[in-house]
């Protein structure tokens, strides 16, 4: 199976976790796009969705799936999204698609976070994939200097503005032994909106696409 076929398999497998009559949190990226395609097949069974990006919102609306503002709802039972890396503790690096802040907000609200990914995203130690950090534009240089002090090599992601109007620094050269500690440290930097480490709030279930089928890992 190709990588895209593995992504499609986990996107459809995530439908098993959708409860009829509920609002579903939807992530961003190529794997989440397959979940949106799958969700369209049961769109009349759900109340609607909450979206983590303008890109996902456009795809959902193209299928005629209702999209709610997160502020309009009191609770969210499920959030489904991909990951750039996921370790054995269900902690992740996310934000390759620059939607990390809205993704993290929805993950915080949701009762259950289902991570969908192909097997290439599984790692023992996070950090081979550059760690995205969303930053207020005027703080870019300051935050970059502080990230160097933490052992990283930050690189400004050119020509990318987030849906929130901010910029992204991608941090290389990190071997993230203590993800929660690093998440806390980077989030504490003035000018940082959020970091793409999903460690304090990781996934509850991971659906991993493999050549032998979809593997389910539970926290």
Curated annotation (Swiss-Prot):
Which PANTHER family does the UniProt record give? RIBOSE-5-PHOSPHATE ISOMERASE (PTHR11934:SF0)
The pathway this protein participates in, as annotated, is: Carbohydrate degradation; pentose phosphate pathway; D-ribose 5-phosphate from D-ribulose 5-phosphate (non-oxidative stage): step 1/1
Q: Name one GO biological process term.
A: D-ribose metabolic process
Pfam families reported for this sequence: Rib_5-P_isom_A
Query: What is known about what this protein does?
Result: Catalyzes the reversible conversion of ribose-5-phosphate to ribulose 5-phosphate.
GO cellular component terms, alphabetically, are: cytosol
Q: What is this protein called?
A: Ribose-5-phosphate isomerase A
EC identifiers of the protein = 5.3.1.6
Q: Which domain of life is it from?
A: Bacteria
Quick one: which residues bind substrate? 28-31, 81-84, 94-97, 121
Q: Does the keyword Phosphoprotein apply?
A: no
Q: Which NCBIfam families match?
A: PRK00702.1 (NF001924), rpiA (TIGR00021)
Q: Which reaction is this enzyme known to catalyze?
A: aldehydo-D-ribose 5-phosphate = D-ribulose 5-phosphate
**Which keywords has UniProt assigned to this entry?**
Isomerase
EC main class here is isomerase
Q: Which InterPro entries match?
A: NagB/RpiA_transferase-like, Ribose5P_isomerase_typA_subgr, Ribose5P_isomerase_type_A
Enumerate the CDD domains for this protein: RPI_A
Q: Which family does it belong to?
A: Belongs to the ribose 5-phosphate isomerase family.
Q: What are the recorded GO MF terms, alphabetically?
A: ribose-5-phosphate isomerase activity
Quaternary state and interactors: Homodimer.
Work out whether the entry's keyword set contains Isomerase. yes
Q: Where is the active site?
A: 103 (proton acceptor)
